[in-house]
Design a protein with these regions (language model features):
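A conserved beta-turn-beta hairpin within the catalytic core of GNAT-like acetyltransferases
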Residues: 50-53
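Acidic, metal-coordinating catalytic segment for phosphate/diphosphate chemistry
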Residues: 2-31, 103
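Hydrophobic "anchor" residues
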Residues: 40-41, 122
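NUDIX/MutT-family hydrolases
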Residues: 114, 123-155
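Active-site-adjacent beta-strand/loop module that shapes the phosphate/pyrophosphate-binding cleft
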Residues: 94-121
Length: 163
């Protein structure tokens, strides 16, 4: 498990148990490296904070009573229009974002899965501005986080072993 931020911010109180900003507890999220048969990867441009306007892997928060696999399939469908086969877990990590005052503004525990598109047409859905198929060897224009690039690399290695 790794973390996206250093620093030891303190809890800010949050608006409720379900508030994403200044949460009382970490929020469980799911994400996916959706790899096509020709090896391209699905990326989405985030429409809301955190990461608004930035490219990332598709995903979102888990709903109460939802399994991790069902949650990732739902999020991919909502954000990209694709129906996917959910494969193995690629990694589990946290994303902790601290505000200028040192308080934890966002704290997510994220489970990323390798997925394969089964049907549907790629299009930007809810919570995203755009969705693209990208060459995983040419990701520089998307300015992905180091963690996103690492997860893509790990998923490609897993996909290569599964063939």
């Amino acid at each position: 498990m790794s973390t996206d931020s250093s620093g030891n911010g303190q809890a800010h109180g949050g608006n409720s148990d379900t508030s994403r900003r200044y949460p009382k507890r970490p929020i469980v999220g799911v994400g996916a490296v959706v790899l096509t048969e020709d090896g391209r990867v699905v990326l989405v441009k985030r429409g809301h904070a955190p990461l608004a306007g930035q490219w990332s892997l598709p995903g979102g928060t888990l709903e109460v009573g939802e399994s991790l696999e069902a949650g990732v399939a739902r999020e991919i469908r909502e954000e990209t229009g694709l129906i996917v086969d959910v494969g193995p877990l690629v990694g589990l990590f946290d994303r902790i974002l601290v505000d200028d005052g040192g308080a934890v503004e966002y704290h997510f525990v994220l489970a990323d899965y390798l997925c394969r598109p089964r049907q549907g047409r790629l299009e930007a859905g809810t919570d995203v501005e755009d969705a693209v198929l990208a060459d995983p060897d040419a990701l520089e224009p998307y300015r992905l986080t180091e963690k996103a690039r690492s997860v893509i690399s790990q998923a490609r290695a897993i996909a290569g072993r599964d063939r």
